[in-house]
Amino acid sequence: MSSPQKDIYLIIGGSGFLGRHIVEKLLARGDVVSTFDIVQRYHDVPFYSGDISEENQVSQAVQKSAATCIIHTASPPHGIDDPALYWKVNVDGTQAVINAAVANGVHKLVFTSSAGVVFNGEDLVNTDERLPPPEKSMDAYNESKAKGEELVLAANGKGGLLTVALRPSGIFGPGDRQVMHGLSQVFERNQTNFQIGDNNNLFDWTYVTNVAHAHLLAADRLVPLKHLSEQETSQIINYYLPTVSLTTGSRRQPTSEARPLGPYVVPPPHAEEIEARFNNPDPQAQYTSISYPPPVVRSRFDPLSDAVIARHRALAAINSKEKEAEGPIPTDPLQVAGQVFFITNGEPTYFWDFPRAVWRSLRVSSPSAPSERRRITFPREVGLVLAYAAEWWGWLVGKEPAFTRFRVTFSCVHRWHNIEKARRVLGYEPEVGLEEGVKRMVDWWKAEHGMKP
């Protein structure tokens, strides 16, 4: 029996921050890769220059690269005051990529969306993929990303093309010239003692190679829909998922079986095994002898409950019949094609703890840097007033303000997401924790700017 043919990859936006990390991961495993972008920054893979909104230019790159899988990461950076550019790249450009893919018989399209497509300025707590984008987006960037995502999902099944969209949150890491650049500027201006909000809001940051890893998993598992037996379904949704513990380490859970946490008065049966599994750093090995795997208990409100899965499948079938041959084809929440997935580090942290970890690392290598000063905290309402004044002044002098109401809101709300679907369906597990990720990013930044390690 012959092995399945390997995909040939074209990375749209392959010279960019995320795109480059995807290229490096593909090269590391021996795949054939080309890139399409407006600027060539690397010379280790074939490069095709062009405008993403021009379908003929994208199509030529697809033909020359012989791509069977396109990973579309291209986008203007968040935070620029140019709605027309966002629409041109994220909507018109995405449609051009879809058209070129269908015209040239590409099998797979993986689209980099954003967790921000469901953000409307309110708290997002353990949000899963059932939440639709709001009627009014927070800004032009997320509005255009939501529309691009909609186009990609609607194209699933068109001309044999299978599609999937990933929604990463707060990407950071080596090569980032947005998050790290902004935090470095605050550090250089000695403004690290200012805080807006009470810092009780959890936020999802995601290390860049984890996001790249998720894209490869999505591409690998983007295959035609098949019927899942009850056993296959159970294998996906009922196995034990340990908590992500790359930064915090494994923690002993005070379950009824673990009590009392102190010395036993009368040791229960299997006392030694119980103690051993709570001290075992391998979460899977903790359940080798007693009640393995632990039961997965779901309510009807759970995103992967039987009721929710059945409802999704029924609606997908109805939608497919209405669209007939034009697409989209039926989808299944336990398979990749036609789906969206939140991608995070699985380690939501208090918002201001992340920048302070970066500043702390910068301060260690900068002996001349002033010591950390007493913290000055502004309530959210005050921050919004100051941001409004900054926006007004920026408009008056024709300069883009660095301090905006969006950024104030961004820093004061809960924004963290449920990645169970990605872990179960994609097989995604973060590879690099937040603490290690911050270290790698700061080490890269220091090397780039000639700072002491």
Locations of regions flagged by a protein language model:
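Flexible, glycine-rich beta-alpha linker
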Residues: 119, 140, 160-182, 201
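Mid/C-terminal beta-alpha module of Rossmann-like enzyme folds, strongest
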Residues: 221-401
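Amphipathic terminal alpha-helices
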Residues: 359-362, 417-425, 429-453
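Conserved Rossmann-fold NAD(P)-dependent oxidoreductase catalytic core, especially the SDR/UDP-sugar
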Residues: 96-141, 164
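Non-catalytic, hydrophobic alpha-helical segments
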Residues: 166, 211, 215, 343, ...
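N-terminal Rossmann NAD(P)H-binding glycine-rich loop of SDR-like oxidoreductase domains
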Residues: 2-29
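Active-site Tyr-X1-5-Lys
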Residues: 136-164, 216
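NAD(P)H-binding glycine-rich loop region in Rossmannoid oxidoreductase-like domains
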Residues: 50-92, 96, 100, 117-120
